[in-house]
Amino acid sequence: MAGPTYDESAIIDVRALTKSYGQVRAVAGVDLRIGRGEVFAMLGPNGAGKTSTVEILEGYRQRDGGEVRVLGLDPAKQGRLLKQQIGIVLQSTGVDQYLSVAETIVMYSGYYPHPRPVDEVIELVGLAHKRNSRVVKLSGGQ
């Protein structure tokens, strides 16, 4: 029997995603498709399953049911490969706020076997003009 087909133009393709913690259903049948270049926000009250959903997409948490593809990969089965292609930045982190943008990228590049050049990453995220700025001086969105 053939498995489900996926929209290959989608960066994220989620079908019938479920996740429970004991008797509590945190994620109940989420369907989601995000295409290249789309901007997406997930909003909801505490306990709505936002963090669980994102952690499943990142490959840091196992789903109970449903199908997930991120960049064409199943995070549950190909998490290591996926993590080499994505980056997650939380608005508040434990990073030293007095490091510069460039110093911070150098520090995190050590987690990757084949990191991109620092200046390339800074350019990709639109922070070339903030290269030497201290992280503490950046806005939350930067």
Locations of regions flagged by a protein language model:
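N-terminal acidic, proline/glycine-rich, low-complexity intrinsically disordered segments
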Residues: 1-4
